Amino acid sequence: MTRLVKALVIAYQRFFSARRPYRVCRFEPTCSEYMLQAIDRYHSRGILMGLARILRCQPFARGGYDPLPDHFTLKRNQPK
């Protein structure tokens, strides 16, 4: 399952995201990069983390730097 999701995310990055003249994602790393990192670190639970991040990425979101946390969570990292 994780291989399929990773393949879909990579296809999205190469064929859709790369063709846009501007950056769409409000977060750093982008939502697709975050999803790939989450799957690599947390396997199938990383898919849930990536989906939660995509749901947070909307026009009224604060955005900014939101790295992958050290532990599994579906919430945004809180600045220290």
From Swiss-Prot:
Supply the InterPro entries for this chain. Membr_insert_effic_factor_YidD
Q: Which HAMAP family match?
A: UPF0161_YidD
Recorded source organism is Limosilactobacillus fermentum (strain NBRC 3956 / LMG 18251)
Q: What topology does the record note for this protein and the membrane?
A: Peripheral membrane protein
Give the subcellular location.
Answer: Cell membrane
What family is this? Belongs to the UPF0161 family.
Q: Name one Pfam family in it.
A: YidD
Question: What protein name does the entry list?
Answer: Putative membrane protein insertion efficiency factor
What exactly does this protein do? Answer: Could be involved in insertion of integral membrane proteins into the membrane.
